Amino acid sequence: MKVGAMLATMLLMMCTASAFATVKIYDDRGGQIGEYLAKYRALRVSGEQVVIDGTCASACTMLLGTIPRNRICVTPRATLAFHAASPTPDGNEVSREGSQILWANYPPDVRKWISRHGGLRPRIIYLHGAELFAMYPVCH
């Protein structure tokens, strides 16, 4: 009987710990869109919180439309970097399909900000500071 109670307690502690788990993003330069979508869909289901505490660039930014907003917070060090998708490492070629996938994974206020700053192009645009804090809560 004691073993059963102990196992039940351990299981409860494990569930509680995972319910309050946090994923921190410090320096994520992005990568393959498909890999990031799969990672963020799994993260969405996990219920984990996301703290952006540094650079989140390119495919990393798709978390904004994949993870519920109430589970994302940013620190004063947070910087989001947006650009058009590129199938080549040098970034000189633009992938229209990849850029459409990025765009579809941004919430409306982020799309509006991107549009005001020239849209998704090969040149990187940065969202940070007061403009970012107006969209996402500052982590406490």
Model-derived features: where do they sit?
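Bacterial N-terminal signal peptides that target proteins for export
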Residues: 1-7
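Cleft-lining beta-strand/loop regions that shape enzyme active-site pockets
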Residues: 22-78, 84-88
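N-terminal signal peptide c-region/cleavage motif recognized by signal peptidases
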Residues: 14-18
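Charged, glycine-interspersed solvent-exposed loop segments at helix/strand-loop junctions
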Residues: 24-25, 34, 38-51, 90-140
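N-terminal targeting/assembly segments of extracytoplasmic apparatus and virion spike/baseplate proteins
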Residues: 3, 20, 127-128
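Short, surface-exposed, polar/charged, turn-prone segments marking secondary-structure boundaries
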Residues: 78-81, 108-110
